[in-house]
Amino acid sequence: HEPYRRQRQMCIRDSRIDTTTKLRHIIEQTLDFLHEKDKKDIIKKTCQRTFQALRIDVNHEFEVLYEFMEKLPGALKPGGRAAILTFHSGEDKLVKKALKAGYKAGIYSDYSKDVIRPSAQECAQNGRARSTKMRWAVRAE
């Protein structure tokens, strides 16, 4: 659950938002009551999650990923391997469920039961890698 979402929902609903700056300002206003030492970090994380949710919705990312996972077996030759990178838990759940179902149906001969995460070194070199998860599957012969 998103912290303080009710306050934001009311402000967003009652405002005309036509720029990302206005949306960020509304988020800042709704979180103005927070203690100063926590405020900056919470605002940053809230903005990240809000903009991510908008991007996912606008780009139909779940629908596209679902369609990709449905078509993936047809794109792999027997013994072919696929690796899928996900960047948030919703994507990862969808991929995990699809690979598991494909394995149970005999479409995949093997798949990653556990997620593969980037190393600490990789995250240090590329901060954006920290939320990445990888899962894989092998097309049945």
Identify what each model region corresponds to.
Residues 14-20:
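Short, charged, surface-exposed loops that flank catalytic or proteolytic processing sites
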Residues 12-14, 86-87:
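Conserved proline-anchored active-site loop of SAM-dependent methyltransferases
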